Amino acid sequence: MPTKPAVNWKQTLDVSVICPVFNTPPGVLAVAIRSVLSQAGPHEVELILVNDCSTDPATVAALRDAADGDGRVYVVNQDRNTGPARARSVGVASARHEWIGFIDSDDLWPEGKLDQAASVLQEWPDSRWIGGSFATLLSDGTLRPAQRLTAKCPPSQVGRTAQRLCTPESTRVLVGSWHPLGTSLFRRHLITDAGDFDPRLTYGEDWLLCLRISLLAPMDYINAETYVLRRQGASLMRSPRRLSAKAVEGLQAARRDPALRIARRELRWLVYGGYKEVAMNNALNGQKLRGMLFALLALTVDPREVGELLMFLRLLRRNGPALACGLQRYSTAEQLDFSSIKSLE
């Protein structure tokens, strides 16, 4: 786990933590819950578990037991499955505290996360957004740190505990460097002021909200891990829906947003890369015709890249490891294998 920071009791944080839950295995959910409730210090924490109409009786029972076992845990039951965007919004609406944090039901908060944030607030009392880096916990137990955000800051914005990233620099940095929503803590009003989570999006609704928040407030960025992303088992990030246009909807929404025109060049390249990623993974999963379609959509974003389209079409003659190896030249995105799933959406 990331190193626990020095304790600073001079500043406390009252935080409502939102966690959407849909059929999460009880053992996995219990670890996520414990990582939030075990945060040391005098911070007041409430954990809001939004049950997104789970159908697994074991998950439903685990949610009930969590609320019965700790007065800081509240369960909000939805009568239909709405997806993480709407579930998070419901959680925020139910929150009591000024600061809002997030965790996915299969991820972790590292030890000392709130202590780190409290130290930032001690140095920057006007802080409205406290962010940080993350690490990925692999299935073999290996913890892989992510690349940290880097941005040019004047000396006045570099503090002892964090550096203050302001727009447009912060917006452009966030466009090109995805960080999980759970790395950040927000003052509640920022979420509302930025328009809340877009319930129409399956992917990228959290990233899009952070981009919009970056236009409203600086991010006080801690150069340390404030979140642990688990790559174990099934999740939306490893769903066959990653092979559909839904995987690019959030990117397209950002590109169409007039307020984000300051990052239009970066967003254009991101959409182009998103279509290439979907094209590649369709080809790897036996959907070569669909892959061709998404490769053509990528070309509509940047018609100058005919050479990359021709390379992709040539690679489609290959199969198996030869195809996977060749496609690494077409897209550097993660290659996903859904061969164990009988039917792809």
Give a label for each model feature.
Residues 70-71, 86, 114-190:
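Flexible acidic/His/Gly-enriched loops in nucleotide-sugar-dependent glycosyltransferase catalytic domains
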Residues 51-62, 80, 104:
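A conserved acidic beta->alpha catalytic loop
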Residues 225-233, 238-265, 288-301, 337:
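Catalytic core of nucleotide-sugar-dependent glycosyltransferases
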Residues 27, 57, 107-120, 138:
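Acidic donor-binding/catalytic loop of UDP-sugar-dependent glycosyltransferases
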Residues 100:
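Short aromatic/hydrophobic "clamp" motif used to bind/position activated sugar donors
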Residues 17, 155-243:
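Conserved nucleotide-sugar donor-binding catalytic segment
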Residues 78-95:
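Glycine-rich, basic loop-to-helix element that forms the pyrophosphate-binding segment
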Residues 34-44:
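Short, acidic, metal-binding catalytic loop of nucleotide-sugar glycosyltransferases
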